[in-house]
């Protein structure tokens, strides 16, 4: 079989939207090469789990590589893929010095290329995300989340995912009920289950994402706790009195449903919102306040922000 590699050079803020577009067009795997991963200083208490090579990363910005089976249909779609990516600017997503290149690769290159960018990632001193193909021996009481990131949704390496998992670790109590909005790979639902949640509803509008989530949930043996539903945000979700709602999605999307979050939460319930670039944090913060939520804490990693808010006790 012949494969094509689509290489997109863009900004950190555009990573998830670009990866999602490529996946929706049928990419069989996506890798993300971000120089920030190389330059990021890691705290010694988490330890260095893997060695990064500087030559694997771009000088600036992010390179996203997606792999497509080279068919006549794919070749015809190439201009449409490029234009769809360029159209992301209409949603105020900066693409930077956008570059779009298509190369041919052989079977062996495809099978290994995207995997070399995924390694075990220690999120907290208790939680580590491990690619499903890697052997990893956990320490005592360490929580392991196994992921197959081949569908490009939320591998755990992105700062917003890490911010959400750390917040879940801080706020989730055993027996809590959780809603995970925009679940992607299911990583936040799986983390919630392994932290002791009693029940989790994981929603995503994208059918490919819900399938990826179901596969990862089964891989982690948490399907008895997590229900996956293809759904647009919290529309027609009648659950109330929920302990935690978590959403790792773009700021523009978070702005669409803070009132629905308020209705879903029990008094004192927590909303963990990330996917927020730093310069849009104030707008999201104000929207949450206007919906009646109280800002509890704001955390930041690099250019990304997580806002933790709660419904007041009535």
UniProtKB/Swiss-Prot annotation:
Quickly give the catalysed reaction.
L-lysyl-[protein] + 3 S-adenosyl-L-methionine = N(6),N(6),N(6)-trimethyl-L-lysyl-[protein] + 3 S-adenosyl-L-homocysteine + 3 H(+)
The positions annotated for binding S-adenosyl-L-methionine are: 161, 182, 204, 248
Q: Which GO terms describe its cellular component?
A: cytoplasm
On whether Cytoplasm is a keyword of this UniProt record, the answer is yes
CDD domains membership? AdoMet_MTases
Compartments reported by the entry: Cytoplasm
Query: What GO molecular function annotations does the UniProt record carry, in alphabetical order?
Result: protein-lysine N-methyltransferase activity
Gene Ontology biological process terms from the UniProt entry: methylation
The record's EC number reads 2.1.1.-
Which superkingdom, per the lineage? Bacteria
Principal localization reads cytoplasm
For this UniProt record, give its keywords in alphabetical order, as a comma-separated list.
Cytoplasm, Methyltransferase, S-adenosyl-L-methionine, Transferase
Protein function? Methylates ribosomal protein L11.
Family under the similarity heading = Belongs to the methyltransferase superfamily. PrmA family.
Which protein is depicted? Ribosomal protein L11 methyltransferase
Species in which this protein is naturally found: Listeria monocytogenes serotype 4a (strain HCC23)
The upper taxonomy is: Bacteria, Bacillati, Bacillota, Bacilli, Bacillales
């Amino acid at each position: 079989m012949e494969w094509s590699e689509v290489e997109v050079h863009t900004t950190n803020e555009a990573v998830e939207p670009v990866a999602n577009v490529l996946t929706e067009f049928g990419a069989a795997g996506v890798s993300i090469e971000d120089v920030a991963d190389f330059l990021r200083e890691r705290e010694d208490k988490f330890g260095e789990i893997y060695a990064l090579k500087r030559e694997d990363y771009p000088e600036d910005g992010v390179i996203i590589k997606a792999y497509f089976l080279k068919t006549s249909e794919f070749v015809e779609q190439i201009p449409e893929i490029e234009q769809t990516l360029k159209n992301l600017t209409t949603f105020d997503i900066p693409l930077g010095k956008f570059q779009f290149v298509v190369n041919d690769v052989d079977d062996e290159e495809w099978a290994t290329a995207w995997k070399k960018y995924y390694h075990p990632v220690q999120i907290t001193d208790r939680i580590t995300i491990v690619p499903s193909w890697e052997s990893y021996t956990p320490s005592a009481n360490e929580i392991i989340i196994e992921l197959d990131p081949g569908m490009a949704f939320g591998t755990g390496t992105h700062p917003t995912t890490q911010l959400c998992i750390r917040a879940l670790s801080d706020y989730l109590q055993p027996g809590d009920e959780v809603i995970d909005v925009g679940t992607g790979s299911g990583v936040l639902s799986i983390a919630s289950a392994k932290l002791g949640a009693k029940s989790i509803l994981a929603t995503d509008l994208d059918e490919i994402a819900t399938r990826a989530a179901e596969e990862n949930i089964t891989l982690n043996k948490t399907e008895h706790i997590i229900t996956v539903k293809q759904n647009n945000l919290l529309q027609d979700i009648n659950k109330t009195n929920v302990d935690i709602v978590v959403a790792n999605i773009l700021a523009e999307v978070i702005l669409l449903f803070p009132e629905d979050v308020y209705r879903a939460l029990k008094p004192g319930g927590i909303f963990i919102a990330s996917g927020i670039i730093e310069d849009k944090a104030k707008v999201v913060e104000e929207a949450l306040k206007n919906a009646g939520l109280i800002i509890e804490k704001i955390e930041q990693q690099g250019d990304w922000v997580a806002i933790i808010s709660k419904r007041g006790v009535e």
